[in-house]
Amino acid sequence: MEMRNVKGTKDYLPEEQVLRNKIKRACEDTFERYGCKPLETPTLNMYELMSYKYGGGDEILKEIYTLQDQGKRDLALRYDLTIPFAKVVAMNPNIRLPFKRYEIGKVFRDGPIKQGRFREFIQCDVDIVGVESVMAEAELMSMAFELFQTLNLEVTIQYNNRKLLNGILQAIHIPTELTSDVILSLDKIEKIGIDGVRKDVLERGISEEMADTICNTVLSCLQLSIADFEEAFNNPLVADGVNELQQLQQYLIALGINENTIFNPFLARGLTMYTGTVYEIFLKDGSITSSIGSGGRYDNIIGAFRGDNMNYPTVGISFGLDVIYTALSQKETVSSTADVFIIPLGTELQCLQIAQQLRSTTSLKIELELAGRKLKRALNYANKENIPYVLIIGEEEICTETVMLRNMKEGSEVKVPLSSLSNYL
């Protein structure tokens, strides 16, 4: 049998997983500093839930992994963490609002594979339910900047409002049944350009006259400020969108992050669930062209799941761990899983005890030579693993309660008392 991975999946060896764990910890620490509570939801869901009309829309349905259990029930692997979160809130009406949760977990999409994009991947999500104010969006955007600052990645956030975009299409008389198709085309404008948008809408069955209207509208809007849209399009949805965008902009200025954000009137976030603010996060250096995070406001899903059709104001943000890992792996050197490597020279029993003592009395990560390698080979291993310090312990060191401390970076050695070892590290 040929040993190979399923297309779109990957094994992460220890030197890779160390960096991935660092990203997870940075996410968890940042999320918790913003008052978010952890949540875990099942990977396996009812197909009916994952294909719900308020979810990802027709485009996502093509990418869902489906299966049946032994009871012939139709199931699906989750394609995001948003719909499972909405399900949890709908099933638990006693959850106190506002509710801020985070979840880090695997999701699955049978879609195209490219740099930093796989079919099995990890999303790191934060969602807030119970807040109508766009202050929630501003806080999530601020949190994103803080996270990427922690990871030493410079980013910009593009943002828009679906009310503005829907209102523009309404004002130029795009039929309601075609709105979703046009939005999906406009969402690609930065990748395919205005000519590509025209071709895309034509392929979706939109008339040439309507395609010309759409493209001319796009070109006329590119230089407009947020305030200009209300005058350019006499439409109540446009007015609502402008109002929310102006409020958001005020919060971004107050937080000192407005200069790192860009208003993009045709950013759509293709998913049909969004009802207000939408945003996408990009690396400033452009080393990865796709977004490394995204999100927005979706006020209808939880009410639809509960069956009361009430608005439950909800906004979220999602970070792609795999694409962040790809960005960081191009910049960071491999870090070690251990701070100290202990090499016994005929003192295995005592070194086992010393390793245990150091683990229990310090925060150091300790690795003990277990394979019985000679000193030269053991030092070579520590060097290749980027372990910064090695303790060499023979009979003499045991008798004098000392250790030979080797600094692997400098290549220097010094004998130090075991009791004060931490002072030398």
From Swiss-Prot:
GO terms for molecular function: ATP binding; catalytic activity, acting on a protein; histidine-tRNA ligase activity; transferase activity. It holds the Pfam family HGTP_anticodon. One of its GO terms (cellular component) is cytoplasm. GO terms for biological process: histidyl-tRNA aminoacylation. The keyword Cell membrane does not apply. Its EC number is 6.1.1.21. SUPFAM superfamilies: Class II aaRS ABD-related, Class II aaRS and biotin synthetases. It is found in: Cytoplasm. It is an enzyme of class 6 (ligase). It comes from the Bacteria. Keywords: Aminoacyl-tRNA synthetase, ATP-binding, Cytoplasm, Ligase, Nucleotide-binding, Protein biosynthesis. It catalyses: tRNA(His) + L-histidine + ATP = L-histidyl-tRNA(His) + AMP + diphosphate + H(+). Belongs to the class-II aminoacyl-tRNA synthetase family. Homodimer. PANTHER family: HISTIDINE--TRNA LIGASE, HISTIDYL-TRNA SYNTHETASE. This is Histidine--tRNA ligase 1. It comes from Bacillus thuringiensis subsp. konkukian (strain 97-27). The lineage of its organism: Bacteria, Bacillati, Bacillota, Bacilli, Bacillales.
